[in-house]
Amino acid sequence: MNKELLWEMLATPSASGRETELGKKLYGYAGTFSHQVRTDEIGDVVAVLNPDCDFRVLLAGHMDEIALLVTAVTQEGFLRVNRTGGVFAPLYPGHKVQVITERGPLYGSVVFTREMAKKEDLAPKDLYIDIGAKSKEDALAHVSLGDPVIFDTDCRELLNGCVTGRGMDNRAGAFIVMEAVKKAREMGCAVGVYGAATVGEETTMNGAYFVASRVKPSLAIAVDVTYTSDYPGVDTAATGDVRVGGGPVLVNNPSCHRKLQRLLRRAAEKQGIAVQTEAATGRTGTDGDVIHKTGKGVPFSLVSIPLRYMHSPAEVGSLADIQGCIDLLAQFLADLDPSLDLTWY
């Protein structure tokens, strides 16, 4: 596994709508193994294999992360914020953060009071960020309204091949997409492959729409994270039994294509990879939901990384699960025949 790349991706700020720094790195990396590298007006990065093939497979993993957004500054120089994506405000008081400005990161601390800790309905708009400014004018000399704010946390390797950090949702998925495309080429993949690190999934899903509208894929696989049930306080009867370290997760739901599911399972068997299954009753909540409805419709499925504590500053996943997703998808791509017929009857 290219741990150096994964660690670099997890360390790079990529708030939804501000993915440029990470996108530039992936654009350069994709050029080392793909036949083409493409981008678009909003910053998606696409590694392409066999661009002349009419049978096109889109892999999509979003590279953006949730964040706060600076909305105002008090007369005393404290920053007011609101959410960008699925932010849970009670996690923030007392934490170190980075404000991502045009000049680079600016560090701060989220104001903490005991009264705030007791508040049951704490919302992002209730938070204040202390950057050490002496006044509103002092703060605005360094920060602009609209600047994103992310947790200032590091990635660390834990016991048994686990890893913890901010924004594994879904930089780990974008990493898998790039590495799966690279490995598929090494395995002699013959179909057109478009491995996309998409922008904006946590907010608008515009990245998935831009990519799918241009690629016009024959089929698509979204790569994202999913909740697990292997830690205290989770009811497995309600969530199902999904575990970190248990392997890639495939979802059975009304929109994921059953033939693609079977092909993914077959690829896992070839690689000797254990897979887990989860059930969903409707949308997947991933880029796949948008890709599915572009053009005349795109058959799609979903491969998920088991992840504990999603949208927290210390998400926990498994390096073995990440590698399992890479190997499964590379085998899936290498096995595909351009004559594949996905019609039902």
What is each residue range found by the language model?
Residues 1-345:
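N-terminal hydrophobic/helix-forming segments and targeting peptides
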